[in-house]
Amino acid sequence: MLIITAATLIGLGAAALAVFAPNLLTSIFSRVTGYETIQSRPVQGDPANYDPVAAYASMQAFAGEGAQLISLDAQFVRPDGTLDLTASYTPSPRVSAEFALEVAPPADAPPIGAGGLGTWYRRVTIQAYRPGQQGRVSSRGPGGSVTYTYVNQGMTRDIDDPATDTFTFLPAPTCAFADLWQVALERGAPANAVATIEYDDEGYDFRIRDVNVRVQFDSACQVKD
């Protein structure tokens, strides 16, 4: 009787957490099972005026100690260099940053000659988007298939399994998006538009959808000829 009652109470507690605190439930689930669920935390600063360059350090810290940047993509940047992550239009503003964490080879890693040569990394994706949005994930974990839900508090963290790979790592972005926008405005970009800005090993690629506006910058913020 006590076992049944305890099980019932645990079940009711889990159900309540799933409704009122899904992120806490997924965190508990991760600790118990070892399966890494998507995590979430608030963005740095005002989500309605989110500056991904100014907030970059918080994204890197969320990715994990030693995380190295692979790329950064900001969708729908306003002329002042910020995104309104609370905007209700679709598709909505979003920042995606890809990182890599160097890790030790897993216990079941193949030997050299069977695909085991190279450095092992875990790829980490940090996304900043509209707070309050709920996500649902179905995946296969160490103990079998799992399904869970989470609520975005401002940015999310998703980590892949270890794998060997080769990356070109980037320094932290230093070109203010407002400065890139100023160059685009001088070249005729509409001031009431929003831009997509991508940062990778070739520099910054500034584009405005729907109109023929594209400006490319090097990593020193200078326009490429």
Question: Which residues are covered by each model-predicted region?
Answer:
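Functionally engaged cysteine thiol sites
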Residues: M1, C175, C221
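Intrinsic disorder/low-complexity detector
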Residues: T5, T26, S30, Y35-S40
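A generic structural signal for ordered alpha-helices
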Residues: A6, T37, D158-P162
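Short, non-transmembrane alpha-helical segments in secretory-pathway proteins
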Residues: G34-T86, F167-A195
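Long, charged/polar, surface-exposed segments that mediate recognition or autoinhibition
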Residues: L117-V194
